[in-house]
Amino acid sequence: MSDNSKTRVVVGMSGGVDSSVTALLLKEQGYDVIGIFMKNWDDTDENGVCTATEDYKDVVAVADQIGIPYYSVNFEKEYWDRVFEYFLAEYRAGRTPNPDVMCNKEIKFKAFLDYAMTLGADYVATGHYARVARDEDGTVHMLRGVDNGKDQTYFLSQLSQEQLQKTMFPLGHLEKPEVRKLAEEAGLSTAKKKDSTGICFIGEKNFKNFLSNYLPAQPGRMMTVDGRDMGEHAGLMYYTIGQRGGLGIGGQHGGDNAPWFVVGKDLSKNILYVGQGFYHDSLMSTSLEASQVHFTREMPEEFTLECTAKFRYRQPDSKVTVHVKGDKAEVIFAEPQRAITPGQAVVFYDGEECLGGGLIDNAYRDGQVCQYI
């Protein structure tokens, strides 16, 4: 058995069960483990309660239980500058951003990784459900987590080869119930703590209220594609392509009772387009354009790739042809796709391997740009 005691692994600990078990497994495998709690957001609520303080207490309890040193580090400025400003700019531009992708790229695997290196880390580890496989020449491949329902490679798709070289994902070969069981067997205080949801580091706040603190709402008209006025919308930033709830129109406008969906936006005129039917024509597209395209391994400047892709988290893979030129790509779908949303990530896969991805700029229907921004 190899001696891991000389290998230092710095674990990003959130106070949740996944990162707790990550630290536990590495400690059991004999690594020199240090736990780090990242404070990335000032989340004091109206009652003066800071959930980060509660989470840090959980980190302290687990670190003490498994016998590892721990520290807290503040990345609020980095998060604001690198993730939150981007998040607001995307909403201003009528897009629907995915802050978790940017948070992993800029905070968890950049600011945190850089900090870990100052502590003498050989690797960093997180509680993400993903796997890394290392070739003999040192190349690292990022693979899907074994738990298909929890696989998080979609959110890790912007990581570079250099970042992956320094990363371990100890939970990648486990399913979520197994992780909880390990936590319970070890008597970890976080064993029954519920999973966090909501925006990366912002938590479970009411999204509409939260966003209105930073961006002024700009109500406008809600129209059908053929020009019928359906009332007022609350502000384009509150709606995403393909959304059903929150429109307030129901079946009161005559015709059939099929549900209404957001089928388009016009930022220049502040119009929200709505239509009836899950597969409304305006929601379907045959290709997309992406920018900030990036691969986890070295690739040529220009090439064509046949692979599968995801256009949102937990979506089944779809067959695509990808024409890459620099950091841009045209992605052509084998079958029409529904609600391709500007600002979201498109992520490429070859079987189990996550190859990388980009951010969706526009969707096209038979060569015509869809009115989604």
Swiss-Prot record:
Site (Interaction with tRNA): which residue positions? Answer: 128, 344
Binding-site list for ATP: 12-19, 38, 127
GO terms under cellular component: cytoplasm
**Could you tell me the keywords of this UniProt record?**
ATP-binding, Cytoplasm, Disulfide bond, Nucleotide-binding, RNA-binding, Transferase, tRNA processing, tRNA-binding
Q: SUPFAM superfamilies from the xrefs?
A: Adenine nucleotide alpha hydrolases-like
Region listing for Interaction with tRNA, in residue ranges: 150-152, 312-313
Asked whether the keyword Membrane is assigned, the reply is: no
GO BP: tRNA wobble position uridine thiolation
Keyword Transferase annotated: yes
- What catalytic activity does the UniProt entry give for this protein? S-sulfanyl-L-cysteinyl-[protein] + uridine(34) in tRNA + AH2 + ATP = 2-thiouridine(34) in tRNA + L-cysteinyl-[protein] + A + AMP + diphosphate + H(+)
Q: What class of enzyme is it?
A: transferase
State the EC number(s). 2.8.1.13
Q: Where in the cell is it found?
A: Cytoplasm
- Entry's Pfam families? tRNA_Me_trans, tRNA_Me_trans_C, tRNA_Me_trans_M
Where are the stretches annotated Interaction with target base in tRNA?
98-100
A single Gene Ontology MF term assigned here is:
tRNA-uridine 2-sulfurtransferase activity
PANTHER family reported for this sequence: MITOCHONDRIAL TRNA-SPECIFIC 2-THIOURIDYLASE 1 (PTHR11933:SF5), TRNA 5-METHYLAMINOMETHYL-2-THIOURIDYLATE -METHYLTRANSFERASE (PTHR11933)
Q: What does this protein do?
A: Catalyzes the 2-thiolation of uridine at the wobble position (U34) of tRNA, leading to the formation of s(2)U34.
The entry's family comment says: Belongs to the MnmA/TRMU family.
- Name used for this protein in its record: tRNA-specific 2-thiouridylase MnmA
> Which organism does this sequence originate in?
Streptococcus pneumoniae (strain P1031)
Gene designation per UniProt? mnmA
